Amino acid sequence: MIQHIDVHQVLQESLSSVYADLVTRPTGRVVRERIESVMAAARHPVAVARMDFTGVGCIDYSCADEIVAKLLRGAGRAILLLSGISDGHREAIEPVLAGHGLAVLIERRDGKLEALGAPEAAAALLDELVARRLAARTPGGTVALTLA
């Protein structure tokens, strides 16, 4: 099962209906805890948690660490997949993950997947997706989800 999490909506529900930026560690902690609650409340086992960042203005390093890195450490068997990622989001998330030796999946606009973070962790993540039959390698060498 793929669980969809609207990060912008979680941010608005957690803090303020007009807040669009993920900045400061306390903000990140509140948002992460809310996301963890949503994931824990799922009725069926979650294979992939798609976190949609559409509508999120910016994310700083502390929020990238507090949300993405900590969720990766505590996600269990669920694979985190980030969508709606801007170049600015990527610039904050990538060095945080690389520093922790972690990787996360990014879903590009064309539906293809790429791993972001530490190179070894990124390669292992893509291999795990294929091994678990959650994704398949395409003839062009990219990876695409097989789950709907």
Q: Which positions does each model-derived feature cover?
A:
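N-terminal presequence-like segments and adjacent domain-start helices
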Residues: 1-21
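Amphipathic alpha-helical interaction surfaces in cytosolic regulatory modules
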Residues: 12, 19-48, 53-104
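Short glycine/proline-centered loop/turn elements that form peptide/ligand docking sites
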Residues: 102-103, 121-125, 145-146
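Conserved alpha/beta core segments of nucleic-acid transaction machinery
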Residues: 108-113
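Short amphipathic alpha-helical interaction segments
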Residues: 117-132
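A short, conserved structural fragment
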Residues: 130-140
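Short, cationic-aromatic polyanion-contact patches
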Residues: 140-148
